[in-house]
């Protein structure tokens, strides 16, 4: 059972990180002179968090257990040492606030992606260009 959870989580994170990297595409180096490239910074931050999550989740031996303890980014969270061996006093510190924010943002994005997937009919699963006209209207 934990393996199924682990695989699902990895796939989900991969999808989210792919969507993120696609959405920030050419904005990474864009700078209009007034230093307004902060959006790229936020995107890369989230991407880093996602990548770290992917890395630790794929390394974790007890994936679901590590997720349940929500310390997938802590010191020994890679699951290389089983939790029953680890000393309780060596528990990793609570995650920083920034990670919490990133997690919340990811949750929102996942919910949004789920809604989009539900709304999209099967026969229109081909990608439409976001700004282009809808082919069915012409």
From Swiss-Prot:
One of its GO terms (cellular component) is extracellular region. One of its GO terms (biological process) is cell differentiation. Glycans are attached at residues 37, 87, 123. Highly expressed exclusively within the dorsal esophageal gland cell during syncytium formation in host plants (at protein level). A motif (CLE) lies at residues 127-138. Its main location: secreted. Residues 1-22 form the signal peptide. Residues 23-90 are annotated as: Required for secretion from the host cytoplasm to the host apoplasm. Keywords: Apoplast, Differentiation, Glycoprotein, Host cytoplasm, Secreted, Signal. It is found in: Secreted; Host cytoplasm; Host extracellular space; Secreted, Extracellular space, Apoplast. Residues 66-97, 116-138 are annotated as: Disordered. Mimics host plant CLE extracellular signal peptides that regulate cell fate. May play a role in the differentiation or division of feeding cells (syncytia) induced in plant roots during infection. Belongs to the CLV3/ESR signal peptide family. This is CLAVATA3/ESR (CLE)-related protein 2. It comes from Heterodera glycines. The lineage of its organism: Eukaryota, Metazoa, Ecdysozoa, Nematoda, Chromadorea. The gene is CLE2.
């Amino acid at each position: 059972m934990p393996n199924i959870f682990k695989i699902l989580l990895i796939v989900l994170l991969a999808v989210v990180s792919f969507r993120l990297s696609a959405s920030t595409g050419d904005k990474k180096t864009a700078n209009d002179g007034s230093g307004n490239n902060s959006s790229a910074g936020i995107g890369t931050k989230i991407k880093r968090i996602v990548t770290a999550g992917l890395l630790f989740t794929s390394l974790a031996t007890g994936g679901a257990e590590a997720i349940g303890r929500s310390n997938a980014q802590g010191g020994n969270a890679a699951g290389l040492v089983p939790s029953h061996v680890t000393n309780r006093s060596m528990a990793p510190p609570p995650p920083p606030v920034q990670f919490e924010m990133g997690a919340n943002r990811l949750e929102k994005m996942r919910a949004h992606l789920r809604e989009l997937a539900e709304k999209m009919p099967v026969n229109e699963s081909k990608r439409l260009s976001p700004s282009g006209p809808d082919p069915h209207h012409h």
